[in-house]
Amino acid sequence: LQSILPNESEEHNKNYILQFLRDAFYAQNLVNTAGSIDGAIYQTKDGSSPIEVILEAKSPNNQSEFPSLQNLNCKAMQELVLYFMRERFRNKNITLKHLIMTNGYEWFIIDATEFEKHFADDKKFVKLYNDWDNNKTLFTSTKDFYTEIAKPKIDQVKQNIVFAYIDIRLLKKDTDKLKFYRLLQPAHLLKQIQYADSNKLNTAFYNELLHIIGLEERK
């Protein structure tokens, strides 16, 4: 993540974000783009399983398309709504776990159940999405979906959407950084069962994380 450059393109920085996820946590999973989705994490290495995590990346300088703590309704969120609805209703994917918006520094992590509750469970919204997806509305472009369908709906529910937020630039202590990495572990993002004490990090995993982020254990 030290390779993130604010003045570089979204594509440039996205590659570093996906590489970080592969190297740090997901060597046993496929982490790649998927169609128009910036980043997708699959349960399997060969991608034979459905997508379980969807990631939307923006450049740090692209503030207009990235959320803030005061307002989730931006293009990145509108894109996540579209990708979620496609996975749920076009691809019949019922195994989604989390959706993420990040610029490399800031991370908004949202449980897929929040999207299920606020979007997929709304029959009127689902019908509007399906009509648009089947070219039965006056507008058919993805831009129109963002502005005419997703944006008004997000405005209705944004105050009720629960999310985790971290700005890694504010993480000064090694212990705080390790809490961030724990959020990105498969145990959390893929909701995998943990049999060990959740308050303890596996020693090998802990040491590997320190190596990846260029730290040494301080006692």
Task: Describe the role of every protein-language-model region.
Residues L1-N29, A196-D197, L201-K219:
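Charged, often low-complexity linker/regulatory segments
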Residues I37-L72, E79-K219:
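Charged, often flexible domain-edge or linker segments that flank or initiate folded functional domains
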Residues P6-K14, L69-E79:
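Phosphate/oxyanion-binding active-site loops and adjacent basic polyanion-contact surfaces
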Residues N32-G35:
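Short, glycine-/polar-rich solvent-exposed loops and beta-turns at beta-strand/coil boundaries
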